[in-house]
Curated annotation (Swiss-Prot):
Plays a central role in 2-thiolation of mcm(5)S(2)U at tRNA wobble positions of tRNA(Lys), tRNA(Glu) and tRNA(Gln). Directly binds tRNAs and probably acts by catalyzing adenylation of tRNAs, an intermediate required for 2-thiolation. It is unclear whether it acts as a sulfurtransferase that transfers sulfur from thiocarboxylated URM1 onto the uridine of tRNAs at wobble position. Prior mcm(5) tRNA modification by the elongator complex is required for 2-thiolation. May also be involved in protein urmylation. SUPFAM superfamilies: Adenine nucleotide alpha hydrolases-like. Pathway: tRNA modification; 5-methoxycarbonylmethyl-2-thiouridine-tRNA biosynthesis. One of its GO terms (biological process) is tRNA wobble position uridine thiolation. Belongs to the TtcA family. CTU1/NCS6/ATPBD3 subfamily. It comes from the Eukaryota. HAMAP family: CTU1 (MF_03053). This is Cytoplasmic tRNA 2-thiolation protein 1. One of its GO terms (molecular function) is tRNA binding.
Length: 363
């Protein structure tokens, strides 16, 4: 049973409404919840927002006492609110977890350097430990270098693969086995739409999972914001006056996700519940038995337990996606005669540089 906060507060209007809060019936409603159009006051909004996240955490057994948890911190609204709320709920409900901020520096000048400055301020504000790992150190490439070599249209493909592996590598170095990310309901619904548009039905069910992990890896990922609308996260950050970075990534306008996002906006204007509805559809989606068998045939188990033979990262192929992408980049860089000297190694020419591999990852 919901109990509304009783402390009175004067709040600034966001909506021109005259109704009282539909929950406490005592303060003026200033917010219309996007997911159900419920009109509530600011205090009740804080309460239901935090309570819903807590219920998601508890009902899915996301944490256990004594667990070390890394928050994937980018400085944006989602990860900033996630770090704030997770710290708040950990203290309020005594989860007994240790929270660490884990940031990845992709090497995008004018974007990531500014957002990391926000993360460092958050670290001071929330009094949480912070660790930063860079593409430059992990892969000997920055995203700016990758875009210069491979072009902007494929930037999100490269960044998505490398960032996922970078988070795992960072967590492994910190001996942390649980990474939480700020993916929200909008993100998950967009992913479902993207998979449908691409005809990638095999990923539909996985794209809506609140907890994911790779076979053989002790590092799991979870999304406490699975049922949180992006608009509500923005409102929460605004009314809580949280310090976050709001500039879009330099290369994001070329991303295919933008197409799905525009579709979502059109759907939501007609049916506000469409975001949750799409997630529910993904959750209940069952692959045909024939399709399942076809996909299973493509996965080959090797003697080393499905690990990349170059870097040790989990992979269904002999060479993981990251190593394949980096090899292609090195070949392209060699073709345009851009030479990079590897510290401690003799000067190499052309394709010989492709032989350089990532630091071997062990779990």
């Amino acid at each position: 049973m919901f109990t509304a906060p009783s402390d009175p507060v004067n709040v600034r209007k966001e909506l021109k409404v005259t109704q009282l809060c539909e929950l406490c019936h005592s303060r003026k409603a200033i917010i219309r919840r996007p997911k159900n159009l419920q009109k509530i006051c600011k205090l009740c909004f804080f309460h239901v927002f935090e309570t819903e996240i807590h219920e998601t955490i508890v009902s899915n057994d996301l944490f256990y006492r004594g667990e070390r948890v890394a928050v994937g911190a980018s400085g944006g609204k989602d990860s900033t609110v996630l770090a704030y709320v997770l710290k708040l709920l950990n203290e309020r409900h005594d989860y007994g977890i240790e929270i660490v901020l884990l940031s990845i520096d992709e090497g995008i000048v004018g974007y990531r350097d500014d957002s990391l400055a926000t993360v460092k301020r958050n670290q001071q504000q929330y009094q949480l430990p912070l660790e930063i790992f860079s593409y430059q150190d992990l892969y000997d490439w920055t995203m700016d270098d990758i875009v210069e070599t491979a072009g902007i249209r494929n930037s999100c493909t490269y960044c998505g693969v490398l960032r996922r592996q970078a988070l795992d590598r960072g967590a492994a170095k910190l001996e942390i086995k649980h990474v939480v990310t700020g993916h929200n309901a909008d993100d998950m619904a967009e992913t479902v739409l993207m998979n449908i548009l691409r005809g990638d039905v095999a990923r539909l069910e996985k794209s809506t999972s609140i907890m994911t992990s790779s076979t053989g890896s002790p590092i799991k990922r979870s999304k406490p914001f699975k049922y949180c609308y992006q608009k509500e996260i923005v409102l929460y950050a605004h009314y809580k006056k949280l310090d976050y970075f709001s500039t879009e990534c330099t290369y994001a306008p070329e991303a295919f996700r933008g197409t799905a996002r525009e579709l979502m906006k059109n759907f939501e204007a007609i049916r506000p519940s469409c975001i949750i509805d799409i997630i529910a559809s993904g959750e209940s989606f069952v692959l045909k038995q024939k399709m399942g068998k076809q996909n299973k045939k493509k996965i080959i188990t090797y003697n080393d337990g499905n690990r990349c033979e170059r870097c040790g990262y989990l992979s269904s192929n002999k060479i993981c996606k990251a190593c394949m992408l980096l090899e292609g980049l090195e070949k392209s860089r060699a073709q345009i005669k851009i030479q990079v000297q590897v510290p401690g190694e003799p000067q190499q020419e052309g394709p010989a540089k492709v032989l350089r591999t990532l630091e071997r990852l062990t779990f």
